[in-house]
Amino acid sequence: MILVLLMVILMMIFIVQSIAFITLYERHLLGSSQNRLGPTKVTFMGLAQALLDGVKLLKKEQMTPLNSSEVSFLLVPGISFVVMYLEWFTLPYFFDFISFEYSVLFFLCLIGFSVYTTLISGIVSKSKYGMIGAIRASSQSISYEIAFSLYVLCIIIHNNVFNFVSKFNLSLLIIYIPFLIMVIAELNRAPFDFSEGERELVRGFNVEFARVAFVLLFLSEYGSLIFFSVLSSAMFFKFSIFMAFSIFSLLIFIRSSYPRYRYDLMMSLFWFKLLPISLIMLCFYAVIFYY
């Protein structure tokens, strides 16, 4: 029991430390894409930039809006962080000390629940910008989650288990591109970052959050980004650090290269293109592996 608790604490420290350096890496890549250096002034090559940014955030003042509560401002980001943290326990072969049989179903429950934290955070902020961002995130989640679940079901049929299996699946590569598009939508990253549209929503659902609350939302966002990079590497390419790093870099380059998609085109893409493709692929894998 003590060993399991120690492993859980160490994993949390590992995730937080990874986020600190991954954000620095993202800023350098975004700087390179725009022909600038990125953060390089704080210590050697800017390595302490993320740590000092965190200290600066914690020193900010939290202004709680009228008709809202301070408890909800900490509770909702805390739940968001816990959901992100629980996602890591579904990874294959990495955390066997608490592994369980139906990790894929647990994973689908978590990503379905994660949108509620975004919705509630927009509601408790008592801001029209936060509310619009939360509604956008909810409608976006409804549009892609059905197709995303069907793609995950294709993986279950292929592997014949309800766990994520870490191996190189050549026959699964045909669904990797639509799966990656769904992952980008799940992460609310560009070009599907409608819940955080700066031009029309200031900051989106988290516009009123600061200090610890904003840090928890930030950690949950980038923790999920790292998680999906590792998960994609494990499911499609037999997990390697290089492939996980490459997928993460690809997600950053997509952010730096593509403008925000139009909202109606995003809905059309998920409902009229990716959803029918997911149904066809599900039937294809069912026929191939069961008949």
Swiss-Prot record:
Protein's organism: Caenorhabditis elegans
Reported effect, K238N: In strain: Bristol N2, CB4855, CB4857, CB4858 and KR314
Purpose of the protein: Core subunit of the mitochondrial membrane respiratory chain NADH dehydrogenase (Complex I) that is believed to belong to the minimal assembly required for catalysis. Complex I functions in the transfer of electrons from NADH to the respiratory chain. The immediate electron acceptor for the enzyme is believed to be ubiquinone.
Gene name tied to this protein: nduo-1
Alphabetically ordered keywords of this record: Electron transport, Membrane, Mitochondrion, Mitochondrion inner membrane, NAD, Respiratory chain, Translocase, Transmembrane, Transmembrane helix, Transport, Ubiquinone
Record-given protein name: NADH-ubiquinone oxidoreductase chain 1
Pfam families associated with the record: NADHdh
GO CC annotations on file: mitochondrial inner membrane; respiratory chain complex I
EC number: 7.1.1.2
Bilayer topology annotation: Multi-pass membrane protein
Catalysed reactions, semicolon-separated: a ubiquinone + NADH + 5 H(+)(in) = a ubiquinol + NAD(+) + 4 H(+)(out)
Family indicated by similarity: Belongs to the complex I subunit 1 family.
Disulfide bonds: none
Chief place of localization: mitochondrion
GO molecular function, one term: NADH dehydrogenase (ubiquinone) activity
Transmembrane segments: 2-22, 71-91, 104-124, 142-162, 164-184, 212-232, 234-254, 269-289
Compartment(s): Mitochondrion inner membrane
